[in-house]
Amino acid sequence: MKILVINAGSSSCKYQLLEMDTHAVLCSGLAERIGQDEGRLTHKIAPDTDKEEKIVQTAHFPTHVQAMEMVIALLTDAEKGVIKDKSEIAGIGHRVLHGGEAVSDPVLVDERVKGIVRECAVLGPLHNPANLMGIEVAEKLFPGVPNVAVFDTEFGMGMPKEAFMYALPYELYEDLRIRRYGFHGTSHKYIAGATAKYLGKPLSELRSITMHLGNGSSMSCVRNGKCFDTSMGLTPLEGLIMGTRCGSIDPAIVPFVMEKKGLTPEQVDTLMNKKSGLLGLCGHTDMRDVHAEVEKGNERAALALKMLVRSIKKTLGSYYFLLDGKVDALVFTAGIGENDDIVRAEVCAGLENLGIKIDAKENGTRKAGARAISTPDSSIPVLIIPTNEELQIAMATVEVLGK
């Protein structure tokens, strides 16, 4: 069974075609600059294998339809194609940012589901309209092929009410559904399953803490295989310090800055989402640049690193106690989590008092695949597990189609 996974943005579209019998990625790619004078399509055949072949094409893509038509042409190309006809695709899985409280599982797309995506655009104004566009383009170009929506907020629907409610007037929840939703849910769900598999433990018994650390970062507390708490909130702004996002701050800062700087709500939103975090502290968003500046003696870069690590450790500690100290694994994933040994070492520094011990050599070694970086006598295994959101979406699509 072949599943196409689509992640549509406002001016871009990521895709991946998987053979689900083996979980092999047949091809993947990115169409970008859609709607601009010159678009670009980067297409990889057998990505991340010794047979990888890269094709780059430029063209004018007035809309996502033209971009996806070029993708289909590459998929079915007589010489370079990975399928003979688009009818070989059994289903299409779509990443959708926000489903609100209306959906708690991946769902087969119909008019009701598209209506939910539209309604939740107020909570995901940058992503939901683009995600819906991706669905409608797929319906147009792949008639008769079922589409499945996989929501980034799905995993957070498993939280108990005391975890997702804010201590605001209750009518704000009733009227506006203001609550914690959590994001990176597809990644956290995949990592929960992969962690259980790595440990040889039933998912229904798993108690773990997942650290999805990248330009956008979040953490998830997993109890009995489900989300028990998570760091992001109503929006992806809450929680950890990130590349350009401030993370959790005193809410009173917002009206204070608006008054003192004469800013509009939109300007403050931009300031907190796109001009804060590591960028606001030291002028860099890439951790490699931050580390390089720390080596040069840049005090603001050193401060940014310390604040980032501190925000992770504070959340880690709270989740440890939410799990009553009974934790099966601490798991690092995503760009920083998988590749930054300095951040991992700093996050785990001092945890020896809880019996959690890191193997410095193993932590500093780059390896592919899931692995432990803790010592054999560590009280809790510390793991690196590469995330795979596309595979999780594809597996969810297969599950929905099988119902």
Curated annotation (Swiss-Prot):
EC top class named in words: transferase
Gene name as annotated: ackA
Pathway named in the protein's UniProt entry: Metabolic intermediate biosynthesis; acetyl-CoA biosynthesis; acetyl-CoA from acetate: step 1/2
Family: Belongs to the acetokinase family.
Catalytic residue list: 152 (proton donor/acceptor)
Site (Transition state stabilizer): 184, 245
One GO CC term, this protein: cytoplasm
Catalytic activity entry: acetate + ATP = acetyl phosphate + ADP
Keywords: ATP-binding, Cytoplasm, Kinase, Magnesium, Metal-binding, Nucleotide-binding, Transferase
Quaternary data: Homodimer.
Its job: Catalyzes the formation of acetyl phosphate from acetate and ATP. Can also catalyze the reverse reaction.
Protein name, entry field: Acetate kinase
Annotated ATP binding sites: 14, 212-216, 286-288, 335-339
Keyword Cytoplasm in annotation: yes
NCBIfam families, per the entry: ackA
Binding-site positions, substrate: 95
